[in-house]
Amino acid sequence: MHQIEQCHLWHTKDKQYIVNNKNNRQEKEKHINITYKGMRCSISGKQYEIQIWNILKHCSIRGSPFHTNTLQQLGGSTSNIDIQCNFLSNNDIGIEIKKCRTPDWMQCSIYFDEKKNRWFSSKSRNKHPTISDLFNQLLENKTIFDNATPFFLKEKITYPEWHHIKQSTDKWNDHHFDIPDSTIRNLYREKGCHYIQISEYGLYHLDEDICGFLTPVFQIEQQIRVRVKVHSRENKKGFCRLSIMASCLPKNINSLTKSDFSLDCREKLPKNIAYHESSSSSSPSNIF
């Protein structure tokens, strides 16, 4: 990383930021803790998917295997469906898997269009265009970061510089806006999911309970959160990579009514799913 002898001076239209580089080590250590926290969330989510996979691979419905995908085919931290199951045909049921305390549910990067004077979802980076359209509706008429492209997205800065800027003003704090209670359901339906499994709360349907699990619909007060996200604290040239992210999430997950059914515990599986102790499905098969 390049060294700055004393300080780096940032000028913007409304404020001057001074970064004292004597505190670089302390700033880096703070960020390492933040990075590890984010990594733990991702790892915890993956472990929860595997826990459910280890149960579903032993299950059947209507006399046929309910889940026949391999461990490598789990969605993980990607835009793919977390777990696909079989009802009327192979992989026709999509299930979103969520740890209840995860900070972001459905998220996408956004940018400010100076000609149209509003924020938009970065559609080119989203494999589901209709999801981008839904985010655009949520962002309409929202004032975020003074409705301008943040200067640090136009200029290269180091992570210690960004951390000092963030601590020096509340201008770049997260923004939260209330959104309809159906938003998360609609977003995951567009992704191809029919159900959502939430740790500690259980299984819910998003639109119609097409498998007849007798699950409740996922219904809870929701909000959209807009924040500056650090994707990388240091590239080969010593600069960090930032973006503006929008994500939908429950306002208070504790207010969610628990489901009677869950996929993370064999004793709480829906009544029409049969668990077979000796059954194992290690590779996909065409069963219908």
Where are these regions (language model features)?
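Alpha-helix boundary/N-cap detector
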Residues: 23-26, 47, 126-130
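Interfaces and regulatory segments of ATP-dependent nucleotide/adenylate/phosphodiester-chemistry enzymes
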Residues: 7-10, 14-15, 29, 197, ...
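Charge-dense, extended regions
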Residues: 264-280, 284-288
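A short, surface-exposed helix-loop junction/capping segment
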Residues: 13, 25-40
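Compositionally biased low-complexity segments, especially N-terminal hydrophobic helices
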Residues: 3-4, 9, 19, 23-27, ...
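Catalytic cores of nucleic-acid endonucleases
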Residues: 35-43, 96-215, 219-225, 232-240, ...
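Catalytic centers of nucleases
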Residues: 35-113
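Serine/proline-rich low-complexity intrinsically disordered segments, especially terminal tails, linkers
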Residues: 22, 44, 217, 245, ...
